[in-house]
């Protein structure tokens, strides 16, 4: 287990009001169905990193816990986007803690242009995740890491650097390769690198619009989900709580993302992560590379790949028929980890 003292002083506090943290009206709720809103029993907390940065997190305990998990989202995402998923995980016996990355959700942001993505220091993100997890009470059950997209890439970095912190990991469409559309990947990397060193790192990439110009998505045009309600969750929260908003990628952010995926995609890097991993790969993907998922699944020593050919980028937000297949795989995977901890033989279908 990681010794948190290696990072310096940090602290973990609860409870607090998310809306109060964001300086907004706690009674102003987004126009979303009740299952997408804060679940009963949910508690907010604050984690203070050794450098003083405050990261917001939330906790939903399970009535009869058989495992615990730390959930981290992808680029631009916030805890609120995962309320339904958090509720479903808790109903399955997982005590859930969900963390906002720096610069996203209710965690600390730069004062100037707080919605603008900076060039991310992904090593620091991995440190934040490790420090936060090490500050939690020692687990009596298996501890899992659940991560989506950018969060999945940071998760792999954390798992490689801090072995023993988690017993297993569940990765949803992890950012192991970045789709660049009609622009060849090498050209895109060259452009972002040149823009960064030219002082244009905070400029939005071509075709990206600031959030205020975004309209409510439909399942036909949404790039993350084909579900008519779940595809609007983030828009609902962003339109109601301005403090949660994040703009699209900048040259600086994308340049650092390219560097990260090059690092974590190396065979020797992946070979050093030996805990059980369940990896979901979406078939209708516009953000990350499914081929990179297949390659990683071959190189990781203990990885099960779940391909969802009819899913867009976010399996946790997809239509029930797709989402249920993903949760079926999660149920079986969690049961394996619980059985392994208890020393009971478990049938693997």
Where are these regions (language model features)?
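An N-terminal hydrophobic leader/cap segment in hydrolases
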Residues: 1-48, 55-60
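Alpha/beta-hydrolase active-site loop
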Residues: 117-137
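Alpha/beta-hydrolase-fold enzymes
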Residues: 155-242
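Short beta-strand/loop motif that positions the catalytic acidic residue
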Residues: 273, 279-281
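Acidic catalytic loop of the alpha/beta-hydrolase fold
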Residues: 284-288
């Amino acid at each position: 287990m990681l010794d948190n003292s290696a990072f310096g002083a940090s602290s973990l506090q609860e409870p607090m009001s998310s809306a109060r943290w964001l300086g907004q009206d706690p009674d102003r709720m987004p126009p979303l169905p009740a299952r997408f809103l804060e679940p009963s029993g949910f508690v907010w907390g604050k984690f203070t990193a050794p450098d003083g940065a405050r990261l917001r997190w939330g906790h939903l305990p399970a009535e009869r816990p058989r495992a615990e998990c730390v959930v981290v989202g992808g680029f631009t995402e916030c805890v609120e986007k995962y309320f339904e998923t958090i509720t479903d995980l808790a109903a399955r016996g997982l005590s859930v803690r969900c963390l906002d990355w720096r610069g996203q959700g209710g965690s600390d942001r730069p004062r100037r242009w707080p919605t603008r993505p900076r060039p991310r220091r992904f090593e620091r993100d991995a440190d934040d995740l490790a420090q936060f997890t090490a500050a939690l009470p020692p687990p009596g059950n298996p501890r899992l890491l659940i991560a989506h997209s950018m969060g999945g890439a940071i998760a792999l970095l954390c798992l490689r650097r801090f072995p023993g912190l988690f017993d297993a990991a569940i990765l949803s469409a992890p950012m192991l390769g970045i789709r660049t559309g009609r622009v060849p990947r090498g050209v895109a990397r060259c452009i972002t690198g040149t823009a960064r060193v030219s002082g244009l790192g905070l400029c939005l990439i071509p075709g990206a619009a600031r959030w205020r110009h975004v309209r409510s998505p439909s399942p036909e045009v949404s790039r993350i989900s084909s579900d008519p309600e779940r595809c609007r969750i983030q828009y609902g929260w962003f339109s109601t709580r301005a403090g949660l908003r994040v703009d699209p990628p900048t040259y600086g952010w994308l340049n650092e993302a390219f560097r990260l995926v090059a690092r974590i995609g190396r065979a020797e890097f992946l070979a050093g992560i030996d805990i059980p991993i369940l990896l979901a790969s979406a078939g209708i993907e516009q953000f990350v590379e499914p081929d990179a998922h297949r390659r990683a699944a071959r190189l990781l020593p203990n990885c099960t790949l779940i391909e969802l050919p009819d899913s867009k980028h976010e399996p946790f937000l997809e239509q029930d028929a797709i989402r249920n297949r993903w949760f079926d795989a999660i149920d079986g995977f969690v049961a394996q980890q619980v059985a392994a901890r208890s020393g009971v033989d478990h049938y693997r279908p």
